[in-house]
Amino acid sequence: MNKNRENKSSLHQNKSCAYNIPNYNNIFSFFTLDNYTDFFIEKEKTNHVLFILNGKVKLSTTNSEDKVLEKETMFLISNIDSVIKGTALERTEIVILNIGNSITFYKDYSSKEIKSYCLENIIEFEPLEIRQPILCFLEGIIIYFKYNVHDKQMYQLKKYEFLYLIQAYYEKKETIRFFSPIINNMGEFKKIVFSRYTK
């Protein structure tokens, strides 16, 4: 059995025998599923990016309806969702990135840009195409897993590399819409702090 799957984590075995997705280092996870395999993830209350590299999955969270997502797409699962369930409709490769509850480039966006690009009602699983630089980046992550490289500090640096790549190779509108759950939460937090300390 793969060492990643044997490793203890905050996840627990599902009673219905669906495949439980391991979270080896709490930053990146990688797994392959055969077609028609059910799976579930009990994740931390942080934002996660799911990358569908190959295949097709039907996915749902505690706060949304089922949606089919295809290969070479990525999407954000917000921190309000603690459980993700799905079915692999084809043989599927998935990478998960625990992105945390803040993004370093939030300050680069004006309030006007955020209001014009964000939806009032954020669509769960609004997919974004995985472009070639991100695909190459993910291939490197997969190689680390295949060779059992599990340095948490390195994966932390790779997380920031992903944030750099998405800024470099995607339009500002795409980036804001993709990260809108995080940006909105950070904006609300900033308002609360400002109101408390300016009275």
Task: Annotate each language-model stretch with its function.
Residues 1-22, 147-150:
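A short, N-terminal "cap"/entry segment at the start of jelly-roll beta-barrel domains
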Residues 20-118:
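N-terminal regulatory/effector-sensing and dimerization cores
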Residues 46, 127-131, 152:
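Amphipathic, non-membrane alpha-helical segments in soluble helical-bundle scaffolds
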Residues 59, 166-170:
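Hydrophobic recognition helices of helix-based DNA-binding modules
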Residues 109-136:
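Aromatic/histidine-rich interaction motifs
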Residues 123-124, 142-154, 173-178:
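Short helix-to-loop capping/linker segments positioned immediately adjacent to catalytic or ligand/cofactor-binding
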Residues 131-142, 155-159, 167, 176-199:
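A short, Lys/Arg-enriched amphipathic alpha-helix from helix-turn-helix/homeodomain DNA-binding modules
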